């Protein structure tokens, strides 16, 4: 266990150092700046028209949606190539021959993708809250920032584990499968009202945490009652958090079992 942890920390440190190259830093900044840029343009247009009625809540909603999109995109870029990048770099043979190296690589890349995606999400959230507060005067910006920071913390944790699992299962098509997972599970299944299956999705638990912690941030105040009629009252907050940890642990456990027991092809067949 100590060998795995030391190797994971070393791998995470190495991956984070690689993230500060010009290309990767540019991609990270583009992702982080996309939500606040869109919110700024929408807020500017609203201020010009002079109609701020109801837009404060809409600003929170559009911020949550855009930052969630950026969070998922960053996971696709950093978590899914965990095995393929080593195969492509011709380093898998060395990794496979070292004791505990496979698990260390998996955990290290998981930690790196978690840190990078959370940093991107947190920067985007901070800029969105500043813009919404200065230009629109939203209520309780500090509470909204703290609440959504917690939500994105758990989002990055769970999605990093899931996309790490996808990366070990589908080597060359991990990003495609990851995008399919987002559409099929987090958009379709999570939207099925008041059934047990949507509670197996990450979005359901994150959505409940966001509503409980940040308050109802949709434009229509009466829509909270309609939401509860459709999706039910939800679970206790501690249970939502516990299930998110369980999802991450199960995904990482399966990924660890696969990466240890599976034989990966390191050379192209002629």
Per-segment meaning from a language model:
Residues 2-13, 83-85, 89, 160-193:
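Cytoplasmic juxtamembrane interface segments
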Residues 94-101:
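Short helix-to-coil transition segments within interhelical loops
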């Amino acid at each position: 266990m100590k060998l795995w942890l030391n190797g994971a920390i070393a791998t995470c440190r190495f991956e984070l150092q690689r993230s500060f190259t010009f290309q990767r830093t540019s991609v990270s900044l583009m992702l982080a700046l996309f939500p606040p840029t869109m919110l700024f343009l929408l807020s500017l247009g609203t201020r010009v028209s002079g109609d701020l009625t109801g837009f404060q809540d809409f600003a929170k909603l559009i911020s949550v949606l855009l930052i969630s999109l950026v969070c998922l995109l960053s996971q696709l870029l950093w978590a899914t190539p965990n095995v393929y990048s080593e195969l492509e770099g011709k380093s898998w043979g060395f990794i496979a021959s070292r004791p505990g190296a496979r698990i260390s690589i998996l955990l290290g890349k998981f930690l790196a993708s978690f840190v990078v995606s959370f940093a991107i999400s947190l920067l985007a959230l901070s800029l969105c809250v500043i813009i919404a507060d200065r230009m629109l005067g939203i209520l309780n910006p500090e509470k909204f920032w703290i609440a959504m920071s917690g939500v994105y913390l758990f989002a990055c944790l769970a999605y990093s584990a899931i996309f790490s699992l996808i990366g070990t299962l589908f080597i060359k098509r991990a990003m495609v499968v990851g995008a399919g997972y987002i559409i099929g599970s987090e958009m379709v299944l999570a939207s099925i009202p008041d059934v047990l299956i949507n509670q197996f999705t990450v979005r359901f638990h994150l959505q409940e945490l966001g509503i409980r912690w940040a308050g109802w941030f949709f434009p229509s105040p009466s829509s909270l009652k309609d939401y509860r009629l459709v999706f039910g009252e939800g679970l206790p907050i501690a249970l939502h958090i516990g299930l998110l940890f369980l999802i991450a642990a199960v995904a990482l456990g399966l990924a660890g079992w696969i990466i240890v027991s599976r034989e990966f092809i390191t050379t192209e067949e002629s």
